């Protein structure tokens, strides 16, 4: 099991435009062991951390049956989400979690 309180670096594998200020970020945890042991259920969220800026709670929107892929759909509305919106595929951010009760 992954320690949800540690920040785990993740690479943006794809940035998918959903609407003018909304993007889905397909993330991949950088550490192989963390990736292998990371599990979540529908309804949970991660704290998405941008180094030097802060963090924000974002729901995991990917399939729990594919835990090595972490998708988060983010609307650019505040300081942290606006900074995340500037990132592109290949860049790194941090993930803490998962948190919350699944369905």
PLM region descriptions:
Residues 88-100:
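Acidic-glycine-rich active-site phosphate/pyrophosphate-binding loop
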Residues 52-55, 97-102:
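Short, charged beta-turn/beta-strand-edge "cap" motif at the junction between a beta-strand
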Residues 2-91:
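Ferredoxin-reductase
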């Amino acid at each position: 099991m992954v320690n949800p309180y540690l920040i785990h670096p993740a690479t943006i594998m794809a940035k998918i435009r959903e609407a003018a200020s909304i993007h889905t970020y397909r993330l991949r945890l950088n550490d192989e062991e963390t990736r292998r042991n990371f599990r979540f259920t529908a309804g949970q969220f991660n704290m998405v951390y941008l180094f030097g800026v802060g963090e924000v709670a974002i729901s995991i929107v990917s399939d729990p049956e594919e835990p090595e892929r972490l998708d988060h759909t983010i609307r650019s509305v505040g300081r942290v989400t606006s900074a995340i919106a500037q990132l592109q595929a290949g860049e790194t951010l941090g993930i803490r979690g998962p948190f919350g009760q699944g369905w």
